[in-house]
From Swiss-Prot:
Job of this protein: FAD-dependent monooxygenase; part of the Fusarium detoxification of benzoxazolinone cluster 1 (FDB1) involved in the degradation of benzoxazolinones produced by the host plant. Maize, wheat, and rye produce the 2 benzoxazinone phytoanticipins 2,4-dihy-droxy-7-methoxy-1,4-benzoxazin-3-one (DIMBOA) and 2,4-dihydroxy-1,4-benzoxazin-3-one (DIBOA) that, due to their inherent instability once released, spontaneously degrade to the more stable corresponding benzoxazolinones, 6-methoxy-2-benzoxazolinone (MBOA) and 2-benzoxazolinone (BOA), respectively.
Taxonomic placement: Eukaryota, Fungi, Dikarya, Ascomycota, Pezizomycotina
Protein name in the entry: FAD-dependent monooxygenase FVEG_08293
Phenotype caused by lack of the gene: Does not affect BOA degradation.
Any GO MF annotation of the entry: FAD binding
Main localisation: membrane
GO BP annotation list: secondary metabolite biosynthetic process
Keyword Cell membrane on entry: no
Miscellaneous: Fusarium verticillioides possesses 2 unlinked loci, FDB1 and FDB2, necessary for detoxification of antimicrobial compounds produced by maize, including 2-benzoxazolinone (BOA). The FDB2 cluster arose as a duplication of the FDB1 cluster with rearrangement and expansion by incorporating additional genes.
Induction text: Expression is induced in response to 2-benzoxasolinone (BOA) exposure.
Organism per entry: Gibberella moniliformis (strain M3125 / FGSC 7600)
Similarity remark: Belongs to the paxM FAD-dependent monooxygenase family.
Cofactor: FAD
């Protein structure tokens, strides 16, 4: 690819939720882009996925046509009186805590009356998102192997030998991001790779009739089950026809034993052994027996010192891969895409091109970083903290469910769910314009 001197063109590496959201936004704004995806097609790995109110607010601003399509297929809690519930807390121990004074009648639930739970299957979500993106702007089987920056362009080389030039590279290539490593290894090598959080999980999607046979009415409302160094998460997807679940084991003092990979095929016996013991309700052993014997390490990007350098930036899991316990990773990636798209639109509209635009680009990406990085980092930190609550490792709460629920039920998610994203965009654009004026 050769970029004309007057052409502003964005490379998006990675076709996950954040990359697709950015592509949707850029397409609507008329900003030229190409998505480069390593896989041969869009990935459906991940099964259940959802957006909080902040994610839906961001998508409304990116593409108003998204919401009606998404709401036509997503599903929430079954009970009409539980639509506001994010999760309801119970125990992993025999009896599930049904006899505890804090349990029953949604007493152990947390959420918000202005929140409505919505979850979908990842494939259904991607089908909607990709319907807003021209297929000719997407290239599959593109494994990025090299990045080279010049004052007037960034060059990408792929494993098939193709070399392309773009004005900006936006890396949304997931937790094991090539773009992140390029960005951070020279100055912050300890941040280049994801960090093991001290826990692993097993995951599955099963038909609701099978789930109901095991868990009964506990399948009606999204649940988190708390336990000593173990936990479980479950919620309905696919219009209520299936249950998505994770079963988690915490190993806080151990290192991940499989360097260079985040998953490991193991035996059925090894998987079942993680949920042995008299302190675990037998229903969870029946559930884990339905999972594939694949151990998923729970990794995250514990700290990230910058989301950009010159013409290269990161978003989504490449920037802030997180624990899943606030179901917030996808929405944070969409927020990234929203702010970044407005910055890139501003750069496209500028008459400056080539080397002369580098200062402008730095001002724009610095503004993106200033708005998005602190908020995404806070979400990441809080999601990790919820994990410590689930495994009864929280330094303040321990295994005291009354203390845990007090934390979760008193506005724990309000700051995350109800931001003013229009104000975030305006603040980013204002900072960018001010920086450009100062340097003029």
């Amino acid at each position: 690819m050769t970029i004309q001197s007057n052409e502003f063109n964005v490379a998006i590496v990675g076709a996950g939720v954040a990359g697709l959201a950015l592509a949707m936004a850029l397409h609507r704004k008329g900003v030229l882009f190409t998505i480069y995806e390593e896989a041969k097609e869009y990935s459906v790995v991940g099964a259940g996925i959802g957006f909080g109110p902040n994610g839906m607010q961001a998508l409304d601003l990116i593409e108003p046509g998204f919401r009606p399509l998404y709401e036509g297929l997503c599903v929430g809690n079954k009970s009409a009186d539980a639509q506001w519930v994010f999760f309801e807390g119970y125990l992993l121990e025999p009896g599930l805590g049904d006899n505890k004074p804090w349990a029953g009648n949604l007493k152990s639930a947390w959420g918000n009356q202005d929140y409505v739970r919505k979850s979908a299957h990842r494939k259904e979500l991607l089908d909607i998102m990709t319907s807003f993106i021209p297929i000719e702007s997407v290239k599959f089987n593109k494994k990025l192997v090299s990045i080279k920056e010049y004052t007037d362009r960034v060059m990408l080389e792929f494993a098939d030998g193709e070399i392309v030039a773009h004005s900006i590279l936006a890396g949304s290539d997931g937790i094991a991001s090539t773009v992140r490593e390029y960005l951070l290894r020279p100055t912050h090598p300890e941040e280049a790779l994801p960090v093991y959080s001290g826990a692993h999980c097993y995951r599955a999607v099963i038909p609701m009739d099978e789930a109901y046979e095991i868990m009964g009415e506990k399948t009606d409302v999204a649940k988190i089950y708390f336990g000593h160094n173990r936990g479980a998460v479950s919620y309905r997807i696919t219009g209520g026809k299936e249950l998505n679940f994770l079963l988690i084991k915490a190993t806080p003092n151990e290192q991940w034993p499989y360097p260079g990979r985040v998953t490991k095929q193991i035996t059925q016996e090894e998987m079942l052994a993680d949920f042995d013991g008299d302190n675990i309700d037998d229903r969870f052993r029946r559930l884990v027996a339905k999972a594939k014997p694949v151990k998923w390490g729970l990794f995250h990007h514990a700290k990230t010192s910058t989301y950009y350098k010159d013409r290269v930036c990161i978003l989504g899991d490449s920037a802030h891969a997180s624990m899943p316990f606030q179901a917030a990773g996808a929405a944070q990636g969409v927020e990234d895409a929203l702010v970044l798209a407005y910055i890139l639109e501003e750069l496209m509209k500028s008459p400056t091109r080539g080397s002369e635009q580098l200062e402008e680009i730095n001002a724009g990406l610095a503004a993106y970083d200033a708005i998005r990085r602190p908020r995404a980092q806070k979400q990441l930190d809080r999601a990790f903290e919820v994990g410590t609550m689930i495994y009864f490792q929280h330094p303040e709460c321990g295994d005291d469910m009354t203390k845990i629920l007090h934390k979760l039920q008193n506005g724990w998610l309000d700051w995350l769910w109800f931001p003013d994203l229009k104000a975030d965009v305006e603040t980013a654009l204002s900072q960018m314009r001010n920086d450009v004026q100062k340097k003029a």
